Design a protein with these regions (language model features):
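Non-globular targeting/processing and membrane-anchoring segments
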Residues: 3-387
Length: 387
């Protein structure tokens, strides 16, 4: 019986939010922060984080120290400060309260956690497009130009193959560019995807799909090649069959807000509701039963798995010693003396045959002794009967 293909592709799975990959935003205040500001922070968080993949927690340090507070730099009393934790809690990114005086600083402060110009553009393109390549320019113009050509070539190479995918997508991959001078304003986005959050000479690139989920490893400098990008793009359209490594479907998401408008647009594009509880349960089973799957409820990142992964198969490096081993001491050379041929000696009897012959001899000996004993006993009986 032929195996039934999975009804979902890797891209489809990328739209599902299983609820176990939430960021945590800790907003630290103290007694010197005005109560009105604390209240405004709570109200803004209720709106901004209601549809986001971020948990909000207000922490008053005046009521006691918090274990994560040690990750903060020197804090100014009376000024809120934030700390964004990765889903696994291992990484943290600090956010400072606006130093300028915007109309609503509380809103601007919290909105920077889930929104930015590049993220807004990504969300608009991720829903209709097959995938999106986030390209971060470097300060080195020559490297940036070469890497951008690799990005464009990868998209040109994969686009003719889209109609042949298990679930064709009409919209080819797109590109979102972060100029070098805008890197600082996209620090949360870049940090969450494993990219450098400050200007560097090398350009950077990463493939994204679905609800802002990363596909493959982030690429830097000379690693931004057409081949690497094309491989990641090819995986996006594959069936999520059991043989495909689940690490491709479990890349990190960036912090974002996914409201009613995004859910409606995704439903129209996919033909199913990725937020439907039954769909989420089915996708959760698909992810959990494949190789390199993440245990239920675990939030471990997928980065470590990619070290041994390439398009669904694993590679291991086997060390081979190409130089012959040199013995500690050279082996002694024995002198061989040719002797004249002599008469052939009889072949030695194999140990097994010798042992068998010895056993037979012993049995015959015992039999003769027994016969003699019986004969002697018989003669004695005859003599006694004669008397």
């Amino acid at each position: 019986m032929a195996a039934q293909a999975c009804r979902y592709t890797v891209r489809d799975v990328g739209f599902a939010d299983l609820g176990n990959e939430r960021y945590t935003f800790l907003c630290f205040v103290d007694d010197q922060v005005p109560s009105a500001r604390v209240e405004q922070l709570g109200q803004a968080a209720a709106v901004l984080f209601s549809d986001a993949n971020v948990w909000f927690q207000l922490v008053n340090l005046a009521k006691g120290e918090h274990p994560q507070a040690k990750r903060l730099a020197k804090r100014k009393p009376g000024v809120p400060v934030g700390l964004l934790l990765s889903p696994d809690g291992e990484l943290a990114w600090p956010l400072n309260f606006p130093a300028t005086k915007p109309d609503n600083p509380e809103w601007s402060f919290l909105a920077s956690v889930v929104s930015s110009p590049a993220r807004d553009e990504l969300i608009k393109k991720l829903i209709p497009a097959y995938a999106v390549i986030l390209f971060v320019e470097g300060t080195d113009a020559a490297q940036t130009k070469r890497a951008r050509s690799a990005v464009d070539d990868a998209i040109k190479a994969i686009t003719p193959l889209l109609p042949q995918m298990p679930k064709p997508v009409d919209h080819p991959p797109e590109v979102v560019v972060v100029p070098a001078q805008r890197v600082a304003g996209e620090s949360v986005l870049l940090w969450s995807l494993g990219l450098d959050a400050e200007p560097v000479p090398e350009p950077q690139a990463v493939v994204l799909m679905g609800r802002g989920r990363r596909v493959g490893q982030p690429l830097r400098g000379g690693l931004v090649t057409r081949t690497a990008l094309q491989e990641a793009l090819a995986v996006v359209g594959q069936d999520c069959e059991c043989g495909l490594d689940r690490v491709w479907m479990q890349g990190e998401q960036f912090p974002l807000s996914w409201g009613r408008a995004e859910r409606t647009a995704a439903y129209a594009q996919l033909g199913f509701d990725p937020d439907n509880p039954q769909v989420k349960a089915e996708i959760s089973r698909i992810i959990s039963r494949g190789p390199n799957s993440r245990p239920s409820g675990a939030t471990r990142t997928a980065s470590s798995n990619f070290d041994q992964l390439a398009l669904g198969y694993s590679e291991e490096i086997i060390e081979i010693d190409t130089q012959p081993a040199v013995p500690a001491e050279p082996p002694a050379v024995k002198e061989v003396i040719m002797e004249p041929e002599t008469e052939a000696k009889p072949e030695a009897v194999e140990p097994e045959s010798t042992a068998l012959g010895q056993a037979r001899t012993i049995w015959w000996t015992l039999a003769v002794i027994a016969a003699v004993t019986l004969a002697g006993g018989g003669l004695l009986l005859l003599r006694r009967s004669g008397h």
